Amino acid sequence: KLEYRGYDSAGIAVYDGNKIQMQKAMGRLKVLEEMTQNGATLPGTVGIGHTRWATHGAPSDLNAHPHFNKDHSIVVVHNGIIENYLKLKKKLMSKGYEFLSETDTEVIAHMLDYYYNGDPLATITKVMHRMEGSYALGILFRDHPDEVYAVRKDSPLIVGTSKSGNLIASDVPAVLKYTRDVYFLENEEIVKLTRDGLHFYNIDEEELQKEPTHIEWDMNAAEKGGYEHFMLKEMHEQPKAVKDTLTPRIKNGDVGIEELGMTDEEIRAISKIFIVACGSAYHTGVTAKYIFEKLARIPVEVDLASEFRYRDPILPENTLVVIVSQSGETADTLAALRLAKEKGVRTLGIVNVVGSSIAREADNVMYTWAGPEIAVATTKAYSTQLI
């Protein structure tokens, strides 16, 4: 029921009474269903699953969730972005940990392993204190076979409860088939799900009392988060998308743009900027032209990619060509990028899809963290591109 959000891979981990079994695959959910015979090859009553929209690491089987520690005794799924994951990863590697994927999520699994003392709750809070960013986590510990732990910080997470079982999800539609009674986790809250009940805690490991909310939505409305249309929903998601795009780039009040991959001297040497895009992304460029020329006093030319690629543009030395695309796969825009690279000028991609062609081929890339956009008319993708 969360497929409408868009995803590039999926995976599942199930405890079968002896060990945690796992299967994951790139592509549509149907691929995973076929691999597991619609779940028949992964028997069990305790498990976690995930559909992934790539943020760290391109879509692949290895980068798909769940992720695990070295002996598969701790398994994690994760929505969100761990901003300091590279720092944490370096520390873990210095301790002898090896990584199979490019994701920030695998760092979480190894962090849990590093601090694990037999007490899941204490270990989780210790790791929470060391992670920066947004996350919703689902966690299995092999030595606590009848428990699932879930954690929320700046990323949605709900808990559904019924006589037949308890569930976690990032959005209400996923649980409505089983229950309409849900708990909404607040920031830095943890929940332990067991066969018999739910236990809620704060980051100080103090147990909390929470009341469920009864959901009145029908399934169709729920998939749109209570909005009549996806576009309306995405309009209201713009503040979060803008925040998610800005936050990782602001440190102690300063804007960090290390993603440009340029020194201060190289930035000052830029003599002209071309912004190349199609559709709504082109209009982002038109707006950006006014801002760049007013604040940076650098001449900016905005081109439709379909025109740029065919008109043999004059690209002086010290030109920066900025390529803007939500998908990172727009054919004319990709061709324009390749033309700019052939002419030997520096290129910067601004895209929303990690691992896309433009992201791979541009000299440097800046990601917009808008998440998948379902409506045809753009809203949050435009806003984050402009930011």
Residue ranges and their predicted role:
Residues K1-K224, E228, K240-S271:
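Conserved short alpha-helical segments that host acidic/polar catalytic motifs at enzyme active sites
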Residues G39, D61, H67, E83, ...:
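Functionally constrained cores in energy, signaling, and assembly domains
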Residues R268-I387:
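Glycine-rich phosphate-binding loops that contact phosphosugars or nucleotide phosphates
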Residues Q238-P239, L295:
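Acidic-histidine catalytic/liganding microenvironments
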Residues L232, H236-E237:
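Predominantly extracellular/luminal regions of secreted and cell-surface proteins
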